[in-house]
Amino acid sequence: MRTHYCGHLNKSLAGQTVELCGWVNRRRDLGGLIFIDMRDREGIVQVVVDPDMADAYEVANTLRNEFCIKLTGEVRVRPESQVNKDMATGEVEILAKGLEIINRSDVLPLDFNQKNSEEQRLKYRYLDLRRPEMSDRIKLRAKASSFVRRFLDDNGFLDIETPVLTKATPEGARDYLVPSRVHKGSFYALPQSPQLFKQLLMMSGFDRYYQIVKCFRDEDLRADRQPEFTQIDIETSFMTADQVREVTEKMVREMWQELLNVDLGEFPVMPFSEAIRRFGSDKPDLRNPLELVDVADLVKDVEFKVFSGPANDEKGRVAVIRVPGGAELTRKQIDGYAEFVGIYGAKGLAWMKVNDRAAGVEGIQSPVAKFLSEDVINGILDRTQAESGDIILFGADKANIVAEALGALRLKLGKDLGLTKEGTWAPLWVVDFPMFEEDDEGNLHAMHHPFTSPLGVTAEELKANPAVANSNAYDMVLNGYEVGGGSVRIHNAEMQAAVFDILGIDAEEQQLKFGFLLDALKFGTPPHAGLAFGLDRLVMLLCGTENIRDVIAFPKTTAAACLLTDAPSIANPAALEELAIAVTAAKAKDAE
């Protein structure tokens, strides 16, 4: 039906007759001529309909926005004075010879000339995707996927599919369960990742595997999370952690170079402990110059218990952020930041304005200065390298609360005060994560997943002191987002059983949930390591947006609902009966 895309037309086609298919983006009448901005997925071109072309002119008179049309016309170069430099096709226009309405359109429920609500955009997503901005994002996603496949194919990786209906295993979030009709009372789980299957593929001898795969997690949603998401899944045998990082870093660097013409440079490597200490986060945004500075040793002996309490607690922390120029913050703004850190468990936000550094204590304005000696204040000023006009913000509590609260405050201050260097890129690797993390009850949980190998310890050493062990894991971070995470995997049954024991998974449960894996580990398992990228998050960054819904064709809401199809929906009672399932929640709701 078409010979060209609208957005591909240029001066080299002058004089040629082309056939185009697309939509009316805009129609206007000027001096007897009708001008149509015609749009398809590749762009917009201006069409001129002259009254001399009577049939085409008659049709053009009836056109309205979003009519689907077919056009036959001649490409001609615009006069220099009429060139539109804001359009990719602005040097040419099409003189209409034939015009056909393929389909008419009702008035759209979306207004492309103004901001529509998120709800309206998701309900009429097929219309929202017609907008050039959205179309460009989906096309960039396609290019990113294509690049990944080419890169991994060229580097010897095999694209192998893994099951979607599988067994529930503990991977950190709730599973989406699928009832079995044949095995009544039993359920499949949709995979949170292909983790175990890709490890089994390594045991099968496929030493370089990849897959661009859908994964599912039933968890509370955020702007950068969806219940179903796409993962670039990678696994290798006989490669070290350094080698895995090298090849995956190369992939991301070349992707940015090809798609954005941006050189990310070599990625720095930072231990987890340093990231938490300096930035309060294991995914620090290095575009932001603010850092956390520990001052617990300076305030251990002060009478102010808010500081000295955490300073003398082995699980406590006292840290500060020096904000250049922050002395200009009003009390109302500071109170707003105090309320903000409260979201993360902080009980308040002490502050110290440095009005005149040369004046020492006399140049300080702070509600807590009266509780601190001159030596302590000067020590804090010296350590933070404070200057006149700065403000110092304090966090004092359990170490994890201080890290989370000040880490989040650091990001907010960076944006609010224009300190974060927008439009730049700051990648890094974070390595040497703790093997386990402790919950409020003192129980240990795997920081990544229970198949991650510890770093440099035997099974006996790990069992003797699990709380201090590090894992051979690594995360790729870009502009404060974790875009990929991976690890060296456990490849012998003894170590795997030891990790399960530490996590409180007894021998019976190990066999019930992971018997197939423990058996497989007995048959000459090679050392293996891998990494998985979130494709949605990578594309979100490539597109310069802050919400992954912007780069998914048909996303869910933050309530995990599809406004377009009204999913999830109530199941047919006959289907539920066949599955031997009774929906007690619905019955209870009906009874109310």
Curated annotation (Swiss-Prot):
Residues 195-198 are annotated as: Aspartate. Homodimer. Disulfide bonds: none annotated. NCBIfam families: aspS_bact, PRK00476.1. It is found in: Cytoplasm. ATP binds at R217, D218, E219, Q226, E482, G534, L535, D536, R537. One of its GO terms (molecular function) is aspartate-tRNA ligase activity. PROSITE patterns: AA_TRNA_LIGASE_II (PS50862). InterPro entries: Aa-tRNA-synt_II, aa-tRNA-synth_II, aa-tRNA-synth_II/BPL/LPL, Asp-tRNA-ligase_1, Asp-tRNA-ligase_1_N, Asp/Asn-tRNA-synth_IIb, AspRS_core, GAD-like_sf. GO terms for biological process: aspartyl-tRNA aminoacylation. Belongs to the class-II aminoacyl-tRNA synthetase family. Type 1 subfamily. It holds the Pfam family tRNA_anti-codon. L-aspartate binds at E171, R217, H448, R489. This is Aspartate--tRNA ligase. Gene3D superfamilies: Bira Bifunctional Protein, Domain 2, GAD-like domain, Nucleic acid-binding proteins. GO terms for cellular component: cytoplasm. Catalyzes the attachment of L-aspartate to tRNA(Asp) in a two-step reaction: L-aspartate is first activated by ATP to form Asp-AMP and then transferred to the acceptor end of tRNA(Asp). Its EC number is 6.1.1.12. It is an enzyme of class 6 (ligase). It comes from Vibrio parahaemolyticus serotype O3:K6 (strain RIMD 2210633). It comes from the Bacteria.
